[in-house]
UniProtKB/Swiss-Prot annotation:
The lineage of its organism: Archaea, Thermoproteota, Thermoprotei, Sulfolobales, Sulfolobaceae. Pfam families: Cytidylate_kin2. Belongs to the cytidylate kinase family. Type 2 subfamily. One of its GO terms (molecular function) is dCMP kinase activity. It comes from the Archaea. This is Cytidylate kinase. The gene is cmk. Gene3D superfamilies: P-loop containing nucleotide triphosphate hydrolases (3.40.50.300). It comes from Saccharolobus islandicus (strain L.S.2.15 / Lassen #1) (Sulfolobus islandicus). It is found in: Cytoplasm. GO terms for biological process: pyrimidine nucleotide metabolic process.
Length: 189
């Protein structure tokens, strides 16, 4: 089964995806890690690579290609990505969206990245604005449309372990192996 975990910065998607992958003994891949690796190779931080990506679609295509290669080659996979739910939904079994209010996400990011709360707020707003513009421009995606997701979870007042339990309960309640909407074909992406 291939499961997508999407959501905005600070929603808990990486922590939840890693824990879920461990619980299910699935392979885990992170679009954010792929993106950060590209940034590091280019000598940029995330904000500046996002700025470059606004005018250079090749950066997003590199990330997308890498993710799609995993989709084609893995049977049991957890994909953590801001936009995989929209891009790859038709090739996967389950798509989950995690979210939390901006203040909670900023607090999490401030603690995680050891920056001030105000810096975290500023970073999130910049990243989300860049994501919204870029994903709409290049993919025609409205990241506010959550209709592609099977499950949407507010992570505000729930810890990672309980979110994973909730997801596992959901997975046990759906068809043993919900089918992707489309057969995997390398020529598609």
């Amino acid at each position: 089964m291939i499961i997508i975990i999407s959501g905005p910065p600070g929603s808990g998607k990486t922590s939840v995806a890693i824990k879920l992958a461990n619980e299910l003994s699935y392979k885990f891949i992170s679009a954010g890690k792929i993106f950060r690796d590209i940034a590091q190779k280019m000598g940029l931080d995330i904000i500046n690579l996002n700025k470059v990506a606004e005018s250079n679609f090749d950066i997003d295509k590199m990330v997308d290609k890498k993710i799609f290669e995993f989709i084609l080659s893995e049977k049991n996979l957890i994909i953590e990505s801001h936009i995989a739910g929209w891009l790859f939904r038709e090739y996967t079994n389950i798509a989950i969206y995690l979210w939390a209010p901006l203040k909670i996400r900023a607090n999490r990011i401030a603690i995680r990245d050891k920056i001030s709360y105000d810096q975290a707020i500023s970073q999130i707003i910049k990243r989300e604005y860049m994501h919204y513009k870029r994903f709409n421009k290049f993919y025609g995606i409205d990241i506010n449309d959550l209709s592609v997701f099977d499950l949407v979870i507010n992570t505000s007042n729930v810890d990672v372990n309980n979110i994973v339990k909730l997801i596992l309960t959901y997975l046990s309640s759906v068809s043993q192996n919900p089918q992707p909407l489309k057969e995997k074909d390398i020529n598609d992406k």
